[in-house]
């Protein structure tokens, strides 16, 4: 959004289907100066990301853009398409996705790993979010990358209002975990450990799944019987600010 505020013409390609923030956002075509365009998507697990990434790469190749910025290793599989049409390509690697538990075996892992290799081969520049991943690319491929950690806005401190109305939470009454509910984040260990702690604090697990609905169900089954453990689902905006502002501790 700051690029748009500084005069850049920014377009974001998004997959079809309901917006993660809710169906009321489905028809939003502009956000803080950024145009959003929806690309065709095969609505089937394992194909939604692949198909939308392909069509986004194809559309960007034919668009009047100076730079095409591709995020994550899977979508980077198609970075050769805009490159073929003379676009300058930037790839941001958010992590070694092929090593994640949900992709560890089978075709998905191989596809994502090839996306990593394509980024190395075709991207003009690669951005990484951690020193460890930067070291990995240098040692594995001899490829220099740019280490740019994710930036955050300074959160606004808010009193507990929405979280009290929706979840019965008050200031310092809970421990907060916030993130995608995926196995490699170790959430099952957090739940198991918390169940053995004698405290009147609650454990709030805030976040949605990422093609990991079965893991979410596993977590809920693991938490069954302990009414101190609360799953909020995906949160954002004022609700998110309140969760941060009023947590006893968070991880």
Language-model region placement:
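A short helix/loop element that forms part of the nucleotide-sugar donor recognition site in Leloir-type
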Residues: 24-26, 157-169
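Carbohydrate-associated surface elements
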Residues: 132, 151
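An aromatic- and histidine-rich active-site surface loop
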Residues: 47-61, 65-98
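Membrane-proximal helix-turn-helix segments that form the acceptor-binding/catalytic region
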Residues: 58-61, 84, 107-126
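Acidic donor-binding loop of glycosyltransferase active sites
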Residues: 124, 245-251
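Conserved donor-binding/catalytic core segment of Leloir-type glycosyltransferases
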Residues: 127, 168-198, 203-204
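Nucleotide-activated donor-binding/catalytic signature segment of Leloir-type glycosyltransferases, i.e.
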Residues: 216-242
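Nucleotide-sugar donor phosphate/pyrophosphate-binding loop at the beta->alpha transition
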Residues: 51, 88, 99-118, 158
